Amino acid sequence: MVTARETRRNGSRPSGLKKWRQKLDGILLPLAGILGFLIIWQIFSSSGATRLPGPLSLFTEERTRELLLYPFLDRGGLDKGLFWQTIASLTRVAQGFSIAAIIGISVGILVGLNRQLNAMLDPLFQFLRMIAPLAWVPIALVAFQQNQPAAIFVIFITAVWPILINTAEGVRQIPQDYNNVARVLRMSKSKYLMKVVLPAALPYIFTGLRIAIGLSWLAIIAAEIVMSGIVGIGFFIWDAYQQNYVSDIILAVIYIGAVGLLLDRFVAWLQRWILRNM
């Protein structure tokens, strides 16, 4: 005789197997897609239809294989492994992005709380955010006369707008009930800011931060390609192109994509952690 407990136990097995199957699908299907893309790319390259090397060139080209196996290589000057090139670019991104986050969130809150200020500044913000990052490079070089501060400025001016605009929108979307409660409780401005404005606007702020971190990474790569004589993965790509090291470029592009993905995931994790602990 089958008991109710056994029925429940047997009934739970398919759901457990289904969960494991879903987890495996979440891993195997993306891997299958990537593998299929690499195979098609290699076949297309081997057929002679293009001069673009296939993914196997990362292992068959001696110089590229050295870069792949020895990312911490440092011969001094600009001759560094991809780890150090990436770290140099990330350092600039961290500086420019941090400045953009501080200014973007602060100004965004002010603009979101003040309708007249928003009406006065919004057209200027919309105008400036439409300017491509590369267009700022010559202006930054003329203004700062040095590559490092110019690169940081390009990152800042690229990243600040999505942070500022999303923060302002988040503040404007605060429910009126929250504001009414704050008035009834006679909250001070600082307490209103910390207890009402920031928690309510936080999802919008992090949306802006996620957009901005991706744009910052794209901007520094583009800026470093234009700027000469600096350590960074963007200049590494341009230098490899000048010397016709196409396999090196492909490896650097893989680094760029992987780092960009990690940056986005880090900001998403930070958002979940902060919201969970508030």
Curated annotation (Swiss-Prot):
Transmembrane domains' residue ranges: 24-44, 93-113, 124-144, 151-171, 196-216, 217-237, 249-269
Single GO biological process annotation from the record: monoatomic ion transport
Q: Which residues form a coiled coil?
A: none
Q: How does it sit in the membrane?
A: Multi-pass membrane protein
Induction profile: By carbon dioxide-limited conditions, probably via CmpR.
**Classification via InterPro entries:** MetI-like, MetI-like_sf, NtrB
Q: Name one GO molecular function term.
A: nitrate transmembrane transporter activity
The subunit structure is: The complex is composed of two ATP-binding proteins (CmpC and CmpD), a transmembrane protein (CmpB) and a solute-binding protein (CmpA).
The text of the family note is:
Belongs to the binding-protein-dependent transport system permease family.
- This chain belongs to the protein called Bicarbonate transport system permease protein CmpB
